[in-house]
Every structure is written in structure tokens, then in C-alpha cells.
A protein has these predicted regions:
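N-terminal pre-domain/capping segments
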Residues: 1-89
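Active-site acidic/histidine proton-transfer and metal-coordination neighborhood
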Residues: 69-152
Length: 152
């Protein structure tokens, strides 16, 4: 795999991305290492236009974002707008926070919510991705949770 096919997820260096100055210094280091793409996640409350400008100044591509559940589900249009600012097609839901993954009713409500958001993404030419973890490989009522998510 070539380095231009790999992106750095900012979540791994989130402690150094909480304000504009630190973020820009971190982005410069990422660029100097040789990366050309990043995934926005775990950064502080920094205006998306400022982040985009920083990336443009350094010739870094924003290939994806990770957004909290509540943002994707309750503020879908805001997330899509941010993707438009970033000239980015992909965002991922990083973790089923506040969802009891042993409760089928909660799982199904979560699936319904992300399907609604996913439909809005699709209508705007964006892709909502799902970042799974080990917990989605558990079974509830004899069905693997991740299979239920993808099936519905």
C-alpha cells in the first residue's frame, strides 16, 4: 500500500488537536511525515472553515470524518454541511454511544435512526459509514448485532 492511500485519523492525536494553534502544528507534522490525507475526528470546537483552510494551506485532503451519534442522528444536515465545507464524501458513526447493545428494542431504534440519517446522506451524495467494534459481534436473540445492522 502506498502512503498516499493511507490517511491519519486525528483521533489518535486528539490531545494535540483541541485548539487552532495545536491543530495546525499537528497537521504540519502529519504533512512533513509524508501523509496527504486525514480523517477529522476528536478535534476541538474549531470552525470547519478554519480546518478546511488549514488543510488547503498544507495540501492535505480531508478524506472522511467521524461524528458523534447524536450529531449524525439529531443534526444530520449540520454534518452534511460540514462535509460539504470539507469537500468530503464520507462520515462514519464511531460508536453506538448510549445504546444498550443487549436490548433488541434499543438496537432496532438505533438502526432506524441511522437509516434515516443515511438516507439524508445518500440524497446529498454523501456516504454514512459505520465503524464497528467487538461489541457488534455479540449475539442478541441468536443474531449477530452487526449482521442485524447491515440487514436493516
Amino acid at each position: 500500500m502506498k502512503i498516499n492511500q493511507i490517511a491519519v485519523t486525528l483521533y489518535t492525536i486528539r490531545d494535540f488537536c483541541q485548539n487552532e494553534k495545536d491543530l495546525f502544528e499537528s497537521l504540519k507534522k502529519i504533512k512533513n511525515i509524508g501523509y496527504s490525507s486525514i480523517q477529522i475526528s476528536g478535534v476541538g470546537l474549531i470552525d470547519p472553515k478554519t480546518i478546511k483552510r488549514m488543510c488547503e494551506d498544507l495540501s492535505l485532503v480531508i478524506c472522511a470524518t467521524h461524528e458523534p451519534n447524536e450529531q449524525i442522528i439529531n443534526n444530520t444536515d449540520e454534518v452534511i454541511n460540514k462535509l460539504n465545507i470539507f469537500n468530503c464524501e464520507y462520515s462514519a458513526l464511531p460508536y453506538p454511544l448510549n445504546v444498550d447493545m443487549k436490548n433488541l428494542e434499543e438496537i432496532d431504534k438505533f438502526i432506524e435512526d441511522i437509516n434515516i440519517a443515511g438516507s439524508k446522506f445518500h440524497a446529498e451524495g454523501k456516504v454514512l459509514c459505520y465503524h464497528n467494534h467487538a461489541l457488534e459481534f455479540q449475539k442478541v436473540q441468536n443474531e449477530i448485532i452487526l449482521e442485524r445492522i447491515y440487514k436493516n
